[in-house]
């Protein structure tokens, strides 16, 4: 594989604010996807006091080929975690929060009720905080979406991760159309919730396959699409097929807008929760503007 190009090089994380966020995460015994997934944007985000909390432990029941999170038999859920999450968010002073999780196929509802408890605990401390959740597919368990919908998240994100043809190699224990159906069900049951999904480029997909995923997501009513470069976290993960240049990401962005997405993030370093607060604000402004036009 070719060497990593310059456009993917980032500064080593550090600084006083970064250290403060690190200390807070440790104090409240929280996991973050920023660390567990070896996100390249951790330095920038943490220096803005933005951290994506990963709930339900640090051990996943899946074994996706792209992911750096540990795989195995997870511990029982920590009943105090929602309270710690709420306290940490309050301490950080965040106005928009992103909560994600490992897959917990061992739980009857896949962890949906734990997500809902975390959302409620955050809002109990500050009802003005907006909450974005990035969930697994819950193995299609029918109760999961209803449980989460009852907590009224502002943004529901579930990532397709890659094109259907590559699922057997990239997400061998997941099904593409299960994920699409989840996103459609969320929108059908909660039309006011912004829905969001992302997938990685550079795994061997073709342009035609990328366009088809866009069409599938639009048919599912998804508002916001995210496309970023896959980066191999360790030598044990699936290799990068190619590094997609920024100009190609720009072409995908233009196509996605042409297909009707309200918001598109497409760049080599784009990630699901990267600039999430700014993007949510833009989505709200766009919805308000459209409502005014239709009055």
From Swiss-Prot:
Binds 2 [4Fe-4S] clusters per subunit. One cluster is coordinated with 3 cysteines and an exchangeable S-adenosyl-L-methionine. Its EC number is 2.8.1.8. It is an enzyme of class 2 (transferase). InterPro entries: Aldolase_TIM (IPR013785), Elp3/MiaA/NifB-like_rSAM (IPR006638), Lipoyl_synth (IPR003698), rSAM (IPR007197). Its cofactor is [4Fe-4S] cluster. Pathway: Protein modification; protein lipoylation via endogenous pathway; protein N(6)-(lipoyl)lysine from octanoyl-[acyl-carrier-protein]: step 2/2. It is found in: Cytoplasm. Gene3D superfamilies: Aldolase class I (3.20.20.70). It comes from the Bacteria. It holds the Pfam family Radical_SAM. GO terms for cellular component: cytoplasm. Residues 46-262 form the Radical SAM core domain. [4Fe-4S] cluster 2 binds at residues 60, 64, 67. It catalyses: [[Fe-S] cluster scaffold protein carrying a second [4Fe-4S](2+) cluster] + N(6)-octanoyl-L-lysyl-[protein] + 2 oxidized [2Fe-2S]-[ferredoxin] + 2 S-adenosyl-L-methionine + 4 H(+) = [[Fe-S] cluster scaffold protein] + N(6)-[(R)-dihydrolipoyl]-L-lysyl-[protein] + 4 Fe(3+) + 2 hydrogen sulfide + 2 5'-deoxyadenosine + 2 L-methionine + 2 reduced [2Fe-2S]-[ferredoxin]. [4Fe-4S] cluster 1 binds at residues 34, 39, 45, 273. One of its GO terms (molecular function) is metal ion binding. Keywords: 4Fe-4S, Cytoplasm, Iron, Iron-sulfur, Metal-binding, S-adenosyl-L-methionine, Transferase. The keyword Nucleus does not apply. Belongs to the radical SAM superfamily. Lipoyl synthase family. HAMAP family: Lipoyl_synth. This is Lipoyl synthase. It comes from Anaplasma marginale (strain St. Maries).
């Amino acid at each position: 594989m070719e060497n990593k190009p310059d456009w993917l090089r980032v500064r080593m994380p550090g600084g006083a604010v970064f250290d403060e966020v690190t200390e807070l995460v440790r104090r409240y015994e929280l996991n973050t996807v920023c660390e567990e997934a070896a996100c390249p944007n951790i330095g920038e985000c943490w220096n803005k006091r933005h951290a994506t909390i990963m709930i339900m432990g640090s051990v996943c029941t899946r074994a996706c080929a792209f992911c750096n999170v540990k795989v195995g038999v997870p511990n029982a859920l920590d009943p105090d975690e929602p309270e710690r999450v709420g306290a940490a968010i309050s301490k950080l002073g965040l106005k928009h929060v992103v909560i994600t999780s490992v897959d917990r196929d061992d739980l009857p509802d896949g962890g949906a009720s734990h997500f809902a408890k975390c959302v409620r605990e955050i809002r109990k401390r500050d009802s003005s905080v907006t909450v974005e959740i990035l969930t697994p597919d819950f193995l299609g368990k029918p109760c999961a979406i209803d449980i989460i919908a009852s907590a009224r998240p502002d943004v529901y994100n579930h990532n397709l991760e890659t094109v259907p043809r590559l699922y057997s190699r990239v997400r061998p224990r997941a099904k593409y159309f299960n994920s699409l159906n989840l996103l459609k069900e969320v929108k059908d049951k909660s039309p006011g919730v912004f829905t969001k999904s992302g997938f990685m480029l550079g795994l061997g997909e073709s342009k035609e396959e990328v366009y088809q995923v866009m069409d599938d997501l639009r048919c599912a009513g998804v508002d916001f699409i995210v496309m970023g470069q896959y980066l191999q976290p360790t030598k044990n993960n699936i290799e990068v097929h190619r590094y997609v240049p920024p100009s190609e990401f720009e072409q995908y962005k233009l196509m996605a807008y042409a297909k009707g997405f309200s918001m598109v993030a497409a760049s080599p370093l784009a990630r699901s929760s990267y600039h999430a607060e700014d993007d949510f604000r833009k989505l709200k402004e766009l919805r308000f503007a459209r409502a005014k036009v239709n009055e």
